[in-house]
Amino acid sequence: RRAIRRSCGLSCGIKWPNDLVLNRKKLCGILTELGLEGESGAVDYVAVGIGINVSQTSEDFIPEVRGVATSLAQALTPPPARNILAAAVLAALDDMYASFPAAREEYLKRYRAGCLTLGRPCRLLRADGTSEEAFAED
């Protein structure tokens, strides 16, 4: 969120747990993996995959996602240069990594403040294909 705000001037919301949303449409997806050292519990590695829709028009998305996906090009003319956006993402990740875990509570506070899902009804999808209505609580 910080990288997009700093490089583009746009404010995104978070759709729990790992999507960034702009104008009620998915702009970005984030996947993470964390490895801990067995005995100490210290962080061994963090792998982060970030996909930001930068230059797509609505026609570039397959019909099934056109109504729920967006890109920076649809919000800004011109869209940001990819190198500027990538540098902003790397700087934000660097800042977060350098201050974690000391700033953990601050990150959780920011996440909660930006989360569009908390306090709202949602649908819980299970691995077996079943689902049920739920309420997103902190």
Walk through the language-model features, giving the residues of each:
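Short loop/edge segments at beta-strand edges and connector loops
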Residues: I14-W16
